[in-house]
A protein has these predicted regions:
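N-terminal, polar/charged subdomain of small-to-medium soluble alpha/beta proteins
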Residues: 1-154
């Protein structure tokens, strides 16, 4: 019994029975540097700019409860490829919009409990190394709704 989720991971249909929700592990993607059409200004719509994407995901720990095969785990490889696919679809006006798309794709996997996402534009101001935002999202265990908290960073 296997089902497919859109992040490209194969998930056993009985996985929920095997997950210990009190235990988690982290998946980290640090400073994924990609070129993107992002921004509201004309020059940002005409030329790609470098962005940095960093993610920290708290995932239900199923490490000891199931067979150690990649298809049984949240795959950072699939997440990276899905982020690249989002950027290939075309121009995005705001980092906040890109952030929500990345959050949504990560939460498609029911094992992901929290997401901390940092998005930075690396070439906006010569006086800074970057400007950007951080987004934190947490699934509420009672009804699987997502609590939202958005903050900006320099």
């Amino acid at each position: 019994n296997i089902s497919v989720i859109s992040t490209g991971s194969w998930v056993p249909t009985d996985l929920n029975k095997k997950i210990k929700s009190e235990n988690t592990y982290k998946i980290l993607i640090n400073q994924l540097i990609l070129d993107a059409f992002i921004g509201i200004h004309d020059f940002e719509k005409k030329k790609k700019q470098k962005i940095s994407i960093s993610l920290s995901l708290d995932v239900n720990d199923n490490i000891s409860g199931i067979e150690h095969k990649i298809e049984n785990f949240v795959s950072y490889e699939h997440i990276v490829e899905d982020i690249k696919s989002i950027l290939k679809k075309g121009h995005i006006d705001l980092l906040e919009t890109l952030g929500e798309k990345i959050v949504d794709l990560c939460f498609e996997d029911e094992r992901v409990m929290t997401i901390k996402l940092k998005l930075e534009k690396l070439e906006v101001f010569k006086e800074t190394s970057s400007v950007g935002i951080e987004i934190f999202r947490k699934k509420n265990s009672r009804n699987d709704s997502i609590e939202k908290n958005l903050s900006t960073t320099d």
